Every structure is written in C-alpha cells, then in structure tokens.
Design a protein with these regions (language model features):
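Accessory terminal helices/loops
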Residues: 127-141, 147-220
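Short active-site oxyanion
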Residues: 18-21, 42-45, 68, 139-140
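A short acidic, helix-capping loop that chelates divalent metal ions and anchors anionic groups
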Residues: 57, 115-120
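Glycine-rich phosphate-binding loop signature in dinucleotide/nucleotide-binding domains
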Residues: 38-42, 79-82, 136
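Core dinuclear metal-dependent hydrolase active-site scaffold
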Residues: 11, 76-101, 106
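Histidine-centered catalytic micro-motifs
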Residues: 46-56, 87-96, 142-150
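Conserved beta-strand hairpin/beta-sheet module of binuclear metal-dependent hydrolase folds
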Residues: 1-39, 98-109, 115
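Active-site metal-binding motif and surrounding structural segment of the metallo-beta-lactamase
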Residues: 29-73
Length: 220
C-alpha cells in the first residue's frame, strides 16, 4: 500500500512456477517483484482499473521490467490458469474497469470500498455498485483500490450506500452545508481516509457523492 495515497497494488498467480498478472501500480512495486520472484512466476499483463495517478504512478516501471501489456478495458482473458473478466464500472471515472478473477475475487478500483463507495457521478456509481457488484456472489472477495479488503456479502449487509440504494434503509433528511451550498445528507459512511463519504442532494435537485471533509452539519 502506498502510504500517502493509501492505494493498493496487487499481483496474483495461478500457481508457483505459473502465470501472474498485476492489478494497478500506484504503490511501490518492490513487494510485487519479490512475490513474482518467490513464486517463480511469469507476468502476463497489468490490469489497470483506471488512469488516476495514484493507481498508475509505477506502471512504467513494471512495463519496463517485464514488457507486458496494460489491460484497461472490459473483456475476457485467460492467462495460464487465470480467468479474468473486465467489467465496465464508470462513476468515479469514465474509464473505470473492475476485474473479476475466476469465482474468487473482484478488484473494484475506486468504485466499491469497505463500508463506502467512490466519489463521482451518483447515478453511475449507484448503477456500477448495484447492477454489477451486487450481482456477484456474496462470498466473493472484494479487493479495492485503497486499504482493506471486504466481501460482496458484507457490503450488501453493512455498506450504508448499498443499504439505502437497495431500500433496506431510508434516505437521510439531515440538512448540511457543502462548499457553501445548502443540501440534504442522504447517506453518510466511513471512508478509507478517515474523513467519511457522503451522498448529498442540493436544493436545486442535483446530487453528488463527496468527501466527508466537505460536509458541514448545520448544528456545527
């Protein structure tokens, strides 16, 4: 994990002496290289969830070292024993892609986190979370772009955004200020950076998913 951005970079392999793929490259690549060496694996590709700097900062180093292609679009691939599906999940960014590996794990980039979702276009984020991720099995591991992993089932049960979007909980009604604009706080959740995440509706009817540091309670 990169200590300033708290961004994750991953490497997975089908077996020792087999095939490996990287997922994002925003963190120091030394642990990834060490893992590949320990496994005696042959890298086949870099899977890029999106092109924000905190996810690609060290991508050029991996490409220079291993001369492998970057995969950054939806599709299906098979490398050795690794079966990978790329799913379009726009919202946090237009180019966001999640990668499902077999029936075991999904790399969600900055769309779905432990207890939170990514900031961005609310309608697109909601569709990506509810129509794509919540269609996956409950026991599937969620490996996000930042900090701790979770599972689809846990987020279905406990993620405040998912609970409201699924109808399990009502939208909030608290009045707040967001950057000098009056708004209603529809959802509040913890977030990986410790500042929280909020879905708000402004008085003109527009919505936004914003970092919690931008939200001021009216009573404060």
């Amino acid at each position: 994990m990169q200590p300033d951005w708290l961004s994750n970079a991953y490497v997975i392999a089908d077996q020792e002496g087999g095939t490996a793929v990287f997922v994002d490259a925003g963190a120091d690549i030394a642990p990834l290289v060490a893992a590949v060496d320990d496994w005696d694996a042959m890298p086949a590709a870099i899977l890029r969830t999106h092109s924000h700097h905190d996810h690609i900062a060290h991508e050029h180093e991996l490409r220079a070292r291993y001369d492998v292609p970057v995969i950054a679009e939806p599709g299906e691939w098979e490398w050795g024993g690794l079966r990978v599906r790329g799913l379009a999940t726009p919202g946090h960014s237009d180019d966001m892609v999640a990668f499902v590996v077999g029936n075991e794990a999904v790399f969600t980039g900055d769309t779905l986190f432990l207890d939170a979702v990514g900031g961005g276009d609310p309608d697109q984020v909601r569709a990506s979370v509810m129509d794509v991720f919540m269609a996956l099995p409950d026991d599937m591991r969620v490996l996000p772009g930042h900090t701790d992993e979770t599972t689809i089932g846990r987020e279905r049960e406990r993620n405040p955004f998912v609970r409201v979007w699924s109808g399990a909980e009502p939208e909030g009604t608290e009045r707040v200020d967001v950057g000098g604009r009056d708004a209603t706080l529809l959802v509040w959740s913890p977030d990986y950076d410790g500042k929280g995440k909020a879905w708000v509706r402004f008085d003109d009817g527009s919505d936004a998913i914003v970092g919690g540091s931008r939200v001021v309670r009216k009573g404060q």
